[in-house]
Amino acid sequence: MNVLVINSGSSSIKYQLIDMEREVPLCSGLVERIGEPMGKLTHKIRPDAEGEEKLTFEQPFTNHVEGMKRVVELITDADKGVIKDKSEIGAIGHRVLLGGEEIKQSVRIDDWAKGVIRDYIPLGPLHNPANLAGIEVAEELFPGLPNVGVFDTEFHQSMPAKAYLYPLPIELYEELKIRRYGFHGTSHRYITKRTAQYLGKPLDELNIITCHLGNGCSMAAVKNGKCVDTTMGITPLEGLMMGTRCGDIDPAIVPFLMEKKNLSPAEADTLMNKQSGLKGMCGMNDMRDLHAARENGNERAQLAFEMFTYRIKKYIGAYYAVLGRVDAVVFTAGIGENDDFVRAEVCAGLDSLGIAVDPARNAVRNGQPRHISPDGSRVAVLVVPTNEELEIAQATLDVLKG
């Protein structure tokens, strides 16, 4: 079966059509700047494979429906298409940010599921409305085709109350559902399953610390194959220092800044989400630019690098304590998979925990799951490339199979 995976943003649609018999993407792409005077569509045929072909188009897209119609035209094009017509698509899997406590696993989209997504718009004001728009577009363009929602928060629903509750008045949780939800769950779940396969260990016996490090960063403590804690909270702002997000700070800083800088709640939110993290410390949110600046003696870039890796190291220690026994520390996503400097610095000084990195292995980049720890290490340190689209497609099939 071919599964179309959709990740709908407020002004974008990211998509991938996957042949699930071979687990190979037939095409992928991104529609950008929806609603602006001029939009852009980047479409790849046979992505990440020999003979990959990239097509780029610039045209206005008034709304998500227009953008998705153009995608369907490309997928089924007589010359460049990868399928003959829409009937060769068996199901659609949607990435959805927040399903709250009501949705603990991937679900077939119906009125109830859409209602839950709407109910959590106050906690996911940017993503949930956009995700819902993507679902409604798919329902319009592919009538009768099953749509499945795969939620970023699913994997973390196994956390115990002691991990997900905040020490605020309990009435605020009961009334407003203020609690830790966690995000990047689709990636953490994929990495957990892939690590079990790679190590040849039963999933229900696997204890690992997963480190999803990209422009957004999160970690998870996984015990017996299930998440027991994660760094992101009620929003993706909590936890690690990120590209533009501050991560953990003293909450009293927020009202202090609002008073001293005369900031509105929205302005304070923008400061913490868009102007902080690596960008706030040194003006750069791309780790590659930061490394170049460090090499040229930029002290703020060096400090930002040290802060970034220090906070990851702290959470490794905390999650080691939570798990008691750790089979592996696993790095994934853009920085986690490709940045040997970050991995080396994070693991430096953790020998007493059985965590160490072999410099030669750490320098290898081959796109495959691999050890970067020395032979005989008590804890394996791994690089495992993530594949959220494949995980969404697999979850979609699992729901349809019942």
UniProtKB/Swiss-Prot annotation:
Class of enzymatic activity (EC top level): transferase
Where substrate binds, per the record, is at: R95
| One example of a Gene Ontology biological process annotation | acetate metabolic process
Q: What is this protein called?
A: Acetate kinase
Q: Which InterPro entries match?
A: Ac/propionate_kinase (IPR004372), Aliphatic_acid_kin_short-chain (IPR000890), Aliphatic_acid_kinase_CS (IPR023865), ATPase_NBD (IPR043129)
| EC number(s) on file | 2.7.2.1
Family, according to the entry, reads as follows:
Belongs to the acetokinase family.
Subunit structure as annotated in this protein's UniProt entry? Homodimer.
